[in-house]
């Protein structure tokens, strides 16, 4: 090996020093920051929307329809839904010190004020809140008041319209936000008018209109809740909080009314917490099942409807009071009431002509029940031949109609025959086809009459046909159906028994001058002891082709002029209603036109998961009057 030269040794040494210096410098140099990384800007994720509080209420079925002003639509569910989704000028508050158990207070969410502003003529001015609107954003206005008045006066089969019959005009002021209502006379019960106001701009244009357009729908509403869906097949009604409501919002977001099913199924549903509130028909066993569930509150309450059997005394065969009395005497009211109630151990019999069992001053005034022998004796005294031989005869025929549904059935075994001049006494009982309870009661009544020899049939009709064409054409001799309970007694008396309620008088048209109607004109009073007077044979036709005609509301077809002054005095407040009832009640029984049967009664229950449910509300609205305040716990 050679020895390295000096030059090479120097180069190696210098290189080593340079390398060492670089390493030292590298160790002292600050490291550069890492390259920036691409990252997403953090965002706050909003929480999911809170599910609306849903309360489920068990019911029997959704009912025949949703117009609260029609006799054929009266039902507990309709009363409840209407109170929750429709605006009212005044609302009922429980008060046992009043004749009907309710006092009526102004609804401040709809009205700014409602006052009597003139006594000559009697005038009430309603000031509507500017923000009050329907769910389609249309304003709630005086036009809606005008429309309801016109319909209540001109449509047949409405609920006790005597108060509306006194109105002579409804004026719209302040851009529709003020309704000035003028009456023909003072009317102390004016606060009970304009409840459950309907959206005129919708109802007048939907198919069927006021009379049948709301049979399965409430497309536009104006209350704390709106109708989300109606499912007749499943018997369900879904109502939801009305987001356009201008007043305090409801606490429940959703209330689902649904069919409860059999008593055992309802008890299981309440026990498991699937159903929180219930209002159903049922007997003592169903009530006991619900009452036995821990922390479940139960009660029995009456609903705002009573069932009656009404004879049409203007029909020639029923013109004789004794014949009517005999027919009503042949009916077993206890059995009819059991059929109407759906049970035989929880029946609330109605045994008065004017007051209902729910009225604080109610006492039974019905005369003692008549025996069948006594009833048949009255028929014999009226010229009928009573044959008690058992025979088989075909079911009696009824007038032909394309709109009828007749329960004729197979030939009946008749234990007798009641006839006059060789013709058997017939009786066609009309009933609304959409009301299965009334149909069942009517069929039972027909069975009882056929059993003694009266050829009775049931004619189930569309409600519009029943209360208009069938009455005008005398196609029915009697009617079985519901009447309202819990309303003003003087109005009830005038609507159902008054002589003016038989007349077809004119109503001012939309643009016609509003003048007070003339006194009703009727035939000369009869000399018969009961002073019963039939209506004119034909309605008077209006001279103005644009005028409307009042629809008679007295379904009996006659009136007693000897008590008309008392009826008028009760209506205008110059006589105490209690004194008037004492005076006229015996006369109404003597007329033998109306047989009260029962007041509808239901079981109500509230589970522990819902607070603020009152089981004793005002009769017209039931337990849902405060549903906007129901609170579901645990949410």
From Swiss-Prot:
Signal peptide positions on this chain: 1-26
Low complexity composition bias: residue spans: 390-411, 511-531
MF term (GO), any: peptide transmembrane transporter activity
GO cellular component, one term: extracellular region
A GO biological-process term: phosphatidylinositol metabolic process
Record pathway: Phospholipid metabolism; phosphatidylinositol metabolism
Region of interest: Disordered: 32-52, 389-412, 511-551
Keyword annotations from UniProtKB, A to Z: Lipid biosynthesis, Lipid metabolism, Phospholipid biosynthesis, Phospholipid metabolism, Signal, Virulence
Origin: domain of life: Bacteria
Matching InterPro entries: SBP_5, SBP_5_dom
Functional summary from the UniProt entry: May directly or indirectly regulate the accessibility of the key branch point intermediate, monoacyl phosphatidylinositol tetramannoside (AcPIM4), to the elongating alpha-1,6 mannosyltransferases which could regulate the lipoarabinomannans (LAMs) biosynthesis.
Entry similarity comment: Belongs to the bacterial solute-binding protein 5 family.
Official protein name in the record: Probable monoacyl phosphatidylinositol tetramannoside-binding protein LpqW
Protein source organism: Mycobacterium tuberculosis (strain ATCC 25618 / H37Rv)
């Amino acid at each position: 090996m050679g020895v390295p030269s000096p030059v090479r040794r120097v180069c190696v040494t210098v290189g080593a020093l340079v390398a060492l210096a670089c390493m030292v410098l590298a160790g002292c140099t600050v490291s550069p920051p890492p390259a920036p990384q691409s990252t997403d800007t953090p965002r706050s994720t909003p929480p999911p929307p809170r599910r609306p509080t849903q309360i489920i209420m068990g019911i029997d079925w959704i009912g025949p329809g949703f117009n609260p002003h029609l006799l054929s639509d009266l039902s507990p569910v309709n009363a409840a839904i209407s109170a929750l989704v429709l605006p009212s000028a005044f609302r009922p508050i429980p008060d046992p010190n009043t004749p009907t158990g309710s006092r009526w207070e102004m609804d401040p969410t709809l009205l700014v004020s409602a006052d009597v502003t003139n006594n000559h003529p009697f005038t009430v001015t309603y000031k509507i809140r500017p923000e009050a609107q329907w769910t389609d954003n249309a304003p709630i206005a005086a036009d809606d008041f005008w429309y309801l008045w016109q319909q209540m006066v001109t449509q047949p089969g409405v609920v006790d319209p005597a108060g509306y019959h006194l109105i002579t005009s409804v004026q719209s002021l302040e851009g529709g936000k003020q309704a000035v209502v003028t009456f023909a006379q003072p009317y102390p019960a004016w606060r009970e008018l304009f409840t459950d106001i309907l959206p005129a701009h919708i109802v007048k244009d939907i198919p069927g209109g006021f009379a049948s357009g709301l049979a399965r729908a409430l497309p536009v509403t104006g209350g704390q809740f709106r109708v989300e869906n109606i499912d007749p097949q499943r018997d369900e009604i879904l109502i939801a909080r009305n987001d356009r409501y201008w007043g305090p919002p409801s606490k429940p977001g959703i209330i689902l009314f649904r069919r409860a099913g059999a008593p055992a199924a309802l008890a299981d549903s309440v026990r498991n917490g699937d159903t929180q509130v219930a209002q159903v028909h049922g007997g003592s066993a169903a009530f006991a099942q619900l009452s036995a569930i821990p922390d479940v509150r139960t009660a029995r309450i009456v609903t705002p409807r009573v069932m009656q059997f009404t004879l049409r005394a203007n029909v020639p065969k029923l013109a004789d009071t004794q014949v009517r009395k005999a027919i009503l005497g042949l009916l077993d009211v206890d059995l009819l009431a059991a059929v109407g109630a759906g049970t035989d151990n929880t029946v609330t019999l109605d045994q008065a002509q004017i007051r209902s069992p729910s009225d604080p001053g109610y006492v039974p005034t019905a005369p003692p029940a008549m025996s069948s022998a006594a009833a048949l004796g009255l028929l014999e005294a009226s010229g009928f031949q009573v044959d008690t031989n058992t025979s088989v005869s075909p079911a009696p025929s009824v007038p032909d109609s394309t709109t009828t549904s007749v329960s004729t059935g197979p030939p009946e075994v008749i234990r007798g025959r009641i006839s006059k001049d060789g013709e058997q006494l017939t009786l066609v009982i009309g009933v609304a086809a959409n009301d299965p309870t009334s149909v069942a009661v009517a069929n039972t009544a027909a069975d009882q009459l056929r059993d003694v020899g009266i050829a009775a049939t049931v004619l189930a009709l569309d409600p519009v046909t029943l209360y208009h064409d069938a009455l005008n054409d005398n196609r029915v001799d009697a009617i079985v159906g519901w009447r309202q309970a819990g309303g003003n007694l003087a109005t009830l008396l005038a609507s159902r028994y008054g002589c003016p309620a038989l007349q077809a008088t004119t109503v001012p048209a939309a643009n016609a001058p509003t003048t007070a109607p003339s006194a009703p004109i009727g035939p000369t009073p009869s000399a018969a002891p009961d002073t019963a007077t039939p209506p004119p044979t034909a309605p008077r036709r209006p001279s103005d082709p644009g005028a409307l005609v009042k629809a008679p509301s007295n379904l009996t077809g006659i009136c007693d002029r000897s008590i008309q002054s008392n009826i008028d005095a009760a209506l205008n407040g110059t006589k105490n209603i209690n004194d008037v009832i004492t005076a006229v009640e015996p006369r109404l029984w003597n007329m033998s036109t109306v047989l009260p049967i029962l007041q509808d009664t239901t079981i109500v229950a509230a589970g522990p998961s819902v607070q603020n449910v009152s089981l004793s509300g005002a009769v017209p609205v039931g337990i849902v009057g405060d549903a906007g305040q129901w609170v579901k716990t645990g949410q």
